[in-house]
Structures are given as structure tokens and as C-alpha cells.
């Protein structure tokens, strides 16, 4: 058996970027790292039904930028932007600095593995037949997607 390599760490710098981009002075790293974990957990709980694929956090000096990649941006933004303002205020209290919130739409959710898995999970939670769900996912995502194979 060969050595096991983390696939995310293996691709960093080549085809993927870090999910958090910031620099911490000596003694502040632990605080900022725990803060990032808290923000990600909060957003996962708050945006459970919004099909969030990726959360990126950048920290320029004395501010923060949070980018949320989702296939349903309307659910996050809400009517007239009310929900996004509430979310921004909650994030500001958690992070302790002014937060700029950026919602990015994923044009082809069929190509995003995180969203495909979330869709399958939602169907299974609704007590759908698992073989039908898997077959439908494989057929749907291979026919629309540029990829030829799907492994579930």
C-alpha cells in the first residue's frame, strides 16, 4: 500500500486555492483560525437549505471578505436583500470586524461534486428509493456535464 495523500492538499496551488486567505502576526494565528472555523460552522447551520458549495474568507487589514458559492443565491439574499443584511450583521458580531459579503452563483451545479452530494442527501432524507436516486443522479449529471463518468 502506498502513502495516502490528502486530495485537497495535493491540488493546492495547482488547480485549487486556499479557502482562507489572510496573514496573522505572531500570537494571532490561533485566534483567527478558530474564528474561521466558527464562521464556517455558523454559515453551514444558517444556510443549510441554500446548497452552499464553498465558503472563502479573506482578511485584508481590519476588515473581512466572505464569498459564498451557491446554486441558489436568491435564498441567501432574500426579498429586497433583507436576509443578506441580517447575515452580514451576524458575521460582523462573530468576526469582530466589518464584513463584506459576496454571493457567487454557480452556473452549472451539475458539475460541482459538493452540490451533487447535497442533492442526493436531500432526496434520501425525503425517503426516496436510494437506487433510483443514484441512477438518476448518474444519468442526469453525466448527460449535462462535460465529464464522462461519475463515481458515487
Where are these regions (language model features)?
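Single conserved hydrophobic/aromatic residue that forms the stacking wall/gate
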Residues: 141-152
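RNA-contacting regions in translation and RNA-metabolism proteins
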Residues: 1-143
Amino acid at each position: 500500500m502506498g502513502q495516502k495523500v490528502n486530495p485537497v492538499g495535493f491540488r493546492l496551488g495547482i488547480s485549487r486555492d486556499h479557502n482562507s486567505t489572510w496573514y496573522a502576526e505572531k500570537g494571532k494565528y490561533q485566534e483567527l483560525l478558530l474564528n474561521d472555523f466558527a464562521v464556517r460552522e455558523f454559515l453551514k447551520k444558517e444556510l443549510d437549505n441554500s446548497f452552499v458549495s464553498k465558503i472563502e474568507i479573506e482578511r485584508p487589514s481590519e476588515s473581512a471578505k466572505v464569498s459564498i458559492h451557491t446554486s441558489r443565491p436568491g435564498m441567501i439574499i432574500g426579498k429586497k436583500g433583507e436576509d443578506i443584511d441580517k447575515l452580514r450583521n451576524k458575521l460582523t458580531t462573530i468576526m469582530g470586524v466589518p464584513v463584506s459579503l459576496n454571493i457567487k452563483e454557480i452556473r452549472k451545479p451539475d458539475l460541482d461534486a459538493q452540490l451533487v452530494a447535497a442533492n442526493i442527501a436531500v432526496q434520501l432524507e425525503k425517503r426516496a428509493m436510494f437506487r433510483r436516486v443514484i441512477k438518476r443522479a448518474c444519468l442526469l449529471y453525466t448527460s449535462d456535464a462535460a465529464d464522462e463518468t461519475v463515481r458515487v
